[in-house]
């Protein structure tokens, strides 16, 4: 959903910004005995996932994806206290910042949980995150001469398995762009020695793109963006009162898929805020953005009865015949009472979402 602009008449003001750069004292880095660090900082493994499908679209349903990334990276083993003699093992620890939900699953978003397994060459080849002190038995010739030794061609963290679990049925799919999953740490030690890991991971796993889909989908406005272009508007709250410049659209809705063959299926809709968020002065309105301050300007949405549709809250579009019909919605710019809005363009972005209830 795209809501645009246009010019609000007022004076423009040029701003000049200045800053001060200060020199901070340098601090020596203290490495732990046996700690492994990646040269140049943690290696980021970017996983691009194909479409992952839940054919039944039922809560608790599982889908498994294997990943194997070709990246290798170089690191350094630190031994500031004493030499680590050859035939030591490399041990790994992995953690995640996602909230736990039990049975080794973590909540990825409101629709999907995830279980993460990294592949390690050792007695436990596919440990589940989180884990600690898992040895890699592939290389038993690792050692370290004071104060450090190179550790080339590391691939740990590059392969494994992701298990997705539906929290609830979804419509149209869920995007996983930019999802940070887990991080891995390493250290070199002999089997009987204590294991301590540094604060910096050697690698991180991030999903750069991926879509989880089902056979159930709703198509809005025949697949085209819903756009409201207000043209030139006034610049005071007297003009920007949520009624002037109002635009009304009649949006076609078509829902199809296995779940929609059940006449008892109940769906609700939600206008989910995008980068412009909600209006700072009233959470019932969409926020706006622009090249100048837009904190006092919002967009109000109303249904055909004139009732306000607050963003990020579920609502009904009325009766749909076999889950097909139309949604009448109006949009209008609204300013904070008593405010004067600076000249320039403005826009708001949001997404219309359907969900089973």
UniProtKB/Swiss-Prot annotation:
Endpoints of the signal sequence: 1-28
UniProt entry tagged with the keyword Signal: yes
Primary site of residence: other
GO cellular component: pilus
Signal as UniProt keyword: yes
Pfam families named among the record's database cross-references: Fimbrial (PF00419)
Alphabetically ordered keywords of this record: Fimbrium, Signal
Subcellular location: Fimbrium
Gene3D superfamilies: Fimbrial-type adhesion domain
A GO biological-process term: cell adhesion involved in single-species biofilm formation
Name of the molecule in the record: Putative minor fimbrial subunit PmfE
């Amino acid at each position: 959903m795209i809501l645009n602009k246009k010019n609000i008449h007022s004076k423009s003001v040029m701003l000049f910004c200045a800053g001060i750069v200060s020199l901070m004292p340098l601090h020596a880095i203290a490495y732990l005995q046996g700690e492994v660090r990646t040269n140049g900082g943690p290696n980021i493994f970017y996983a691009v996932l194909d479409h992952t499908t839940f054919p039944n679209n039922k809560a608790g349903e599982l889908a498994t994806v294997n990943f194997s990334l070709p990246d290798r990276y170089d690191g350094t083993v630190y031994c500031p206290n004493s030499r680590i003699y050859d035939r030591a093992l490399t041990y790994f620890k992995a953690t995640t910042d996602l909230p736990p939900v039990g049975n080794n699953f973590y909540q990825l978003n409101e629709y999907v949980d995830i279980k993460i397994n990294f592949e390690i060459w050792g007695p436990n080849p596919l440990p589940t995150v989180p884990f600690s002190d898992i040895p890699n038995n592939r290389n038993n010739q690792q050692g370290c001469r004071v104060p450090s030794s190179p550790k080339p061609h590391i691939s740990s963290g590059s392969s494994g398995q992701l298990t997705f679990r539906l929290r609830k049925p979804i419509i149209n799919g869920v995007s996983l762009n930019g999802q940070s999953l887990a991080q891995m740490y390493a250290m070199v030690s002999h089997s009987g020695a204590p294991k301590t890991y540094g604060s910096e991971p050697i690698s991180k796993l991030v999903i750069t793109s991926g879509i989880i889909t089902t056979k159930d989908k709703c198509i809005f406005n025949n697949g085209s963006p819903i756009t409201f272009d207000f043209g030139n508007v006034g610049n005071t709250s007297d003009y920007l009162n949520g009624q002037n410049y109002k635009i009304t659209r009649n949006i076609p809705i078509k829902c199809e898929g296995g779940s929609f063959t059940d006449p008892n299926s109940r769906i609700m809709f939600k206008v989910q805020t995008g980068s412009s968020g909600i209006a700072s002065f009233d959470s019932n309105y969409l926020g706006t953005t622009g090249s100048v301050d837009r904190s006092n300007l919002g967009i109000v949405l109303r249904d055909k009865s004139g009732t306000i549709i607050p963003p990020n809250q579920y609502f009904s579009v009325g009766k749909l015949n076999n889950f097909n019909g139309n949604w009448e919605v109006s949009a209008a710019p609204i300013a904070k009472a008593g405010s004067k809005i600076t000249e320039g363009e403005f826009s708001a972005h949001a997404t219309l979402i359907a969900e089973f209830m």
